[in-house]
Regions:
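Substrate-gripping "pore-loop 1 plus following alpha2 helix"
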Residues: 69-70, 126-130, 165-196
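Terminal-proximal interaction/regulatory segments of ATP-powered molecular machines
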Residues: 14, 31-120, 128-131
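Single conserved hydrophobic/aromatic residue that forms the stacking wall/gate
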Residues: 1-11
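Conserved alpha-helical scaffold flanking the Walker A/P-loop in AAA+ ATPase domains
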Residues: 126-148
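Conserved nucleotide-binding/hydrolysis micro-motifs of P-loop NTPases
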Residues: 95-96, 120-122, 152-156, 173, ...
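Short glycine-/polar-rich loops that comprise or flank the Walker A/P-loop
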Residues: 7, 85-86, 109-112, 143-144, ...
């Protein structure tokens, strides 16, 4: 309504500078309040510190400049990831930083990151094995997990079908054999008892 009165540009700029999230508190702390971030310099410092932490432990460090547009996107991605069942489809031109900013948001959230490595011989069998790993880790791991999958990794149409099933139904039909299901139940049993 306000934008239609000719004040749209002012309010759009102000809305872009509204930052809310729990990412200002370090990920290892139990109490992470969801608050408005009013100090943009503090937010920039937090993203740069998270980037430095990631680069210290990563085999593939990232060289990113944390300008305001990038910080806005990291904030959005971090908020989405922290939602229960949070997932995001990031659309844009190649090289625009979607993966790098997602990795940084994952670091800020304190989540584990899982990415597949595509090789020439990578097919449905390897894909299913990787999916099993990520599903078991997500269900039995001690911290939440982000599965980062890029459009450049779609070697087979079945990859997209499996991701669609995970997002819509919460499972990939017939991915686990009966004996694997028994082993999984034994592995996640203690974790499930803690949660409930």
């Amino acid at each position: 309504v306000v934008a239609s009165r000719g004040l749209g540009d002012v309010y759009k700029r102000q809305l872009r500078r509204l930052f809310w999230g729990d990412y200002m508190t370090p990920a290892d702390e139990d109490d992470r309040p969801y608050v408005e971030v009013r100090d943009l310099q503090l937010l920039q410092n937090r993203t740069e510190d998270s980037l430095a932490e990631f680069n210290q432990t990563s085999k593939k460090p990232m060289e990113l400049v944390m300008f305001m547009f990038a910080i806005e996107h990291v904030s959005r991605i971090a908020r989405v990831l922290r939602m229960p069942g949070g997932n995001a489809l990031l659309v844009g031109v190649g090289g625009s930083g979607r993966q790098s900013l997602s990795i940084l948001a994952t670091e800020m959230a304190g989540y584990a990151l899982f990415r597949i490595e595509i090789t020439k011989s990578y097919g449905m069998a390897e894909w299913r094995d990787d999916l099993k790993k990520v599903l078991i880790e997500a269900g039995s791991g001690d911290r939440p997990l982000v599965f980062l999958f890029s459009d450049t990794q779609i070697a087979k149409e079945g990859f997209v079908e499996d991701i669609n099933n995970m997002l819509n139904a919460g499972e990939v039909p017939n991915i686990f054999a009966s004996d694997e299901k028994v082993a999984i139940c034994e592995k996640v049993g203690p974790f499930a008892k803690e949660q409930f």
